[in-house]
Amino acid sequence: MKVLKAAAAHTGLHVDWIPLPIGKEGHEKHGKTTPDETVQELQNTDGWIMGPIGHRAYPRNDPTWIMPPIRKLFDLFANVKPVKSYENIPSIHKNVDIVFLREVTEGMQSWDTNISGSGEFRPNDEISIGSRIITRKGSRRIAMEAFKIARTRQRKQVTAVHKEAVYRLTCGMFAEECRKVASEFSDVEFNEIHIDTIAAHLVMDPTKFDVVV
């Protein structure tokens, strides 16, 4: 809160801060990690910032402690993370300026699988299974966000990351939708890369990337 208030003061912006319980505090005060009162208040605010809510004190086997993804309640599908190097901060690579986008309402954490809860289940003590969901709608709209952001940047480049060669149906669907969206943005360069490959390139030379989805 000290940092947030200092940032607001620096801009001259007047902000009314409303602290709300969530996570461990929410459960201790209201009996659930995402209290209804908190959700209602969030719906009535202009914006909000969520601090760290994970805690090792949550009982492992108590399902009431599972945090219902608040991004699902508000359809916050795009996790946008800019990464940038600064001249006055020592770093291995100079001139790094990347925006990463990740779809966070689908995949392994979709909470919309045919299994209740997180989509994980254990048929016996030797096997655990996790399912994931990839949809055309979800793939298209995260790709669309990536291209919209790229269009506002100097390099105007989007790199789609997937593992289509192995996961032909799920990653394949994501890749297909990225290509369709790319055809609608003739002014933005588009390329694709294998997830294993980009892991190496980000270490060796991250400056070659602009917007990564």
Q: Residue ranges of each PLM-predicted region?
A:
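Glycine-rich phosphate/diphosphate-binding loop of Rossmann-like nucleotide-binding domains
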Residues: 1-10, 120-196
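Acidic/polar, glycine-rich intrinsically disordered N-terminal extensions of enzymes
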Residues: 1-18, 38, 44-45
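N-terminal beta-loop-helix "entrance" segment that forms/cooperates
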Residues: 10-36, 200-202
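Short coil/turn connectors at secondary-structure junctions
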Residues: 11-15, 44-45, 75-77, 94-98, ...
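Short, small-residue-enriched loops and turns at beta-alpha junctions
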Residues: 26, 56, 165-169, 201
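N-terminal glycine-rich phosphate/adenylate-binding segment common to multiple enzyme folds
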Residues: 28-121, 126-129
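Short glycine/threonine-rich loop-to-helix capping motif typified by GTGT followed
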Residues: 30, 168-177, 203-211
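Glycine-rich phosphate-binding loop
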Residues: 39-57, 181, 187-213
